Amino acid sequence: MWKEFREFAMRGNVIDLAIGIIIGAAFGKIVTSFVNDILMPPIGLLLGKVDFTNLYINLSGKNYSSLADATAAGAPVIKYGVFLNSIIDFIIVAVAIFLVVKQINRLKKQEVAAAPTTKECRYCKSEISIAATRCPFCTSELLDTGRPLK
């Protein structure tokens, strides 16, 4: 069982997947930092010095000066500012992944269709080698060699 697991884990696809997950997690942290620390502060400044991470709806009915105070008091809140940051974060990651996949697909070479290796016997309709001059099933002589007889 250990040998089978080792063979499975050492296949190229599993290792590629693990590397992709690690790089994806690191990329996600970079995008989150970009959104929270670089993108949202200027947008908040343009919208009247709004800190999006501090936008919330207090459901308890009491007044709190900040989201941190409401959370510390255990008040139920809807953190829509944090949610907006998460949406922007997701959009940036989705666009980046779309652009990468689009480039990879563009750079992939179009695979050429393989030449046929079999043909159909015109007499018994069996599938035979394309190079056959006589059908191994009905023993009919085939005059057309090298191309399908379908």
UniProtKB/Swiss-Prot annotation:
One of its GO terms (molecular function) is mechanosensitive monoatomic ion channel activity. InterPro entries: Mechanosensitive_channel_CS, MS_channel, MSC/AndL, MscL_channel. GO terms for cellular component: plasma membrane. The chain crosses the membrane at residues 14-34, 81-101. Keywords: Cell membrane, Ion channel, Ion transport, Membrane, Transmembrane, Transmembrane helix, Transport. Channel that opens in response to stretch forces in the membrane lipid bilayer. May participate in the regulation of osmotic pressure changes within the cell. This is Large-conductance mechanosensitive channel. It comes from Syntrophomonas wolfei subsp. wolfei (strain DSM 2245B / Goettingen).
